[in-house]
Curated annotation (Swiss-Prot):
InterPro entries: Tscrpt_reg_Crl, Tscrpt_reg_Crl_sf. Belongs to the Crl family. One of its GO terms (biological process) is positive regulation of DNA-templated transcription. The gene is crl. HAMAP family: Crl. It is found in: Cytoplasm. Keywords: Activator, Cytoplasm, Transcription, Transcription regulation. Residues 99-122 are annotated as: Essential for activity. Binds to the sigma-S subunit of RNA polymerase, activating expression of sigma-S-regulated genes. Stimulates RNA polymerase holoenzyme formation and may bind to several other sigma factors, such as sigma-70 and sigma-32. The keyword Transcription applies. It comes from Yersinia pestis (strain Pestoides F). This is Sigma factor-binding protein Crl. One of its GO terms (cellular component) is cytoplasm.
Length: 133
């Protein structure tokens, strides 16, 4: 599948995967891309399959000359599902914001290298973290 004449989906998937362990290929559908990050383990004493994490996820969609995004911060539960939740621990919040900003910057740079912009989706008004100026 080609998203634009210059950017086939297969090449974009390779570029996105090179950004780090964030791309979830199984959750990428057609022109929708899904990234997540399990940033802070809640209880490391549990067996790996029972652990829960604080983290976040980003969803991208292409449009003319750009990708739009929405993101959420929250809990990745032991069932393997994301739930948007308010983070009450300031240390965890700082870690999540730092991780999200770092990924956002790398993603923005990668997209700029192929002459694409990264912008918030038009209906994404409730941004919990300011990602760019």
């Amino acid at each position: 599948m080609t998203l634009t004449s210059a950017h086939p989906k297969s090449k974009l998937m390779k570029r996105f995967a090179a950004l780090g362990p964030y791309l979830r290929e199984g959750q990428c559908q057609n022109d929708h891309f899904f990234f997540d990050c399990l940033a802070v383990c809640i209880n490391v004493k549990l067996a790996p399959e029972k652990r829960e994490f604080w983290g976040g996820w980003i969803e991208l969609e292409p449009s003319a000359g750009r990708f739009t995004y929405v993101y959420q911060l929250g809990l990745f539960n032991k069932e393997g599902n994301w739930n948007a939740e308010k983070i009450s621990d300031p240390e965890v919040q700082d870690k999540l914001e730092s991780t999200l900003r770092s990924f956002h910057l790398r993603l923005e740079e990668m997209l700029a290298s192929i002459d694409m912009k990264l912008e918030p989706a038009a209906d994404f008004n409730d941004q919990p973290v300011k990602l760019s100026a």
